[in-house]
């Protein structure tokens, strides 16, 4: 099933996780209502995607072509210097934030009006649409709250505070490329 709008999906995943959920990758490619599923990651991931049996609907984008990890790491390290007090920022703590920056910055490479992000460990079970009958995208919200994310967000962006009880973090999200480009 394809949506009424034509767009691609990005799945940001490490090579280890791509292998760990290998049985799910076929379902992601089969059921997402997109033109192409682009797995985003390192050069090692490129090899795994190329060796997979996912077909022509699967592709690869090098994460460094979107935004290098070191750029995000160094930015967070600089902004959090007062908290770190000379300690090294653990690279593992940057991973989740890096994923969010990749999802946003992909808008600069995207040629379509929309693109979707999809978590590689989330398995679609049937065909679905990300748009209603009038072509408006669906927007998922959750009730998750992870205090450490908001502490970090307020450190990086002091003027941004949590003002609604819902979370906008979801296993999948549709992005309007133009809105995202304006936002960033």
For the regions a language model picked out, list residue spans one by one.
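Short, acidic, metal-binding catalytic loop of nucleotide-sugar glycosyltransferases
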Residues: 26-35
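Short coil/turn segments at beta-strand junctions that form active-site/ligand-binding loops
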Residues: 5-7, 35, 112-114
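Short, charged/polar "capping" segments at the starts of alpha-helices
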Residues: 19, 43-50
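Short internal beta-strands
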Residues: 37-42
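Active-site-proximal specificity loops/subdomain of glycosyltransferases
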Residues: 48-108
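N-proximal low-complexity "stem/linker" segments adjacent to membrane-targeting elements
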Residues: 1-26
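Conserved catalytic core of nucleotide-sugar-dependent glycosyltransferases
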Residues: 125-184
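GT-A fold catalytic core of metal-dependent nucleotide-sugar glycosyltransferases
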Residues: 102-141
